[in-house]
Amino acid sequence: MDEIRYPIGKFQAPAAFCEEDAKQWISDIRQIPAKLWEAVSGLNEEQLNTPYRDGGWTVAQVVHHIADASMNAFLRTKWTLTEDVPSIKPFEENDWAKTTEARSLHIEPSLQLLEGLHERWAHLLESMSSDDFQRNFYHEGTKENVPLYVLIAMHAWHGKHHTAQIVSLRQRKGWN
């Protein structure tokens, strides 16, 4: 089950900031929309409404979730760059995945949103200094200060993680 749920493994937070790692995270963030488009290309409505695992979200819900999470992460980035240790509220991703548009809207609006958002986010990240990446926000859910570089690393992993779930489902089902 872990291979299905975590096809690229669980997220491992970096212990320290490294500029070379940051370049890779930014590249990953920029590429997520194209890789996600490729992963869902040619899927019909029935396939889009198939859970990627037993008890998991449907492919469409995963796509909408990536958009939700990316919007949150982009805003967290902006707040962290413009405020002194802003307090960030967590979002209840399972509840968000049950909202009407996450359950019934076609995936194209979320894919289009991701294209523009990730291009904008990557552009912002490329302009940041080493000190910017080490700025912190306070996460109300974990009650911890989180460095921005950890958020960026996590979201680079996050997009690849969910895209791999969809690719894995396609392989298991023979949806080539």
UniProtKB/Swiss-Prot annotation:
Keywords: Cytoplasm, Hydrolase, Metal-binding, Zinc. Binds 1 zinc ion per subunit. Signal peptide: none annotated. The keyword Cytoplasm applies. Its main location: cytoplasm. Its EC number is 3.-.-.-. InterPro entries: DinB-like, DinB/YfiT-like, Put_metal_dep_hydrolase_YfiT. GO terms for molecular function: hydrolase activity; zinc ion binding. Zn(2+) binds at H65, H158, H162. It comes from the Bacteria. The keyword Manganese does not apply. Homodimer. Possible metal-dependent hydrolase. Belongs to the metal hydrolase YfiT family. This is Putative metal-dependent hydrolase GWCH70_0602.
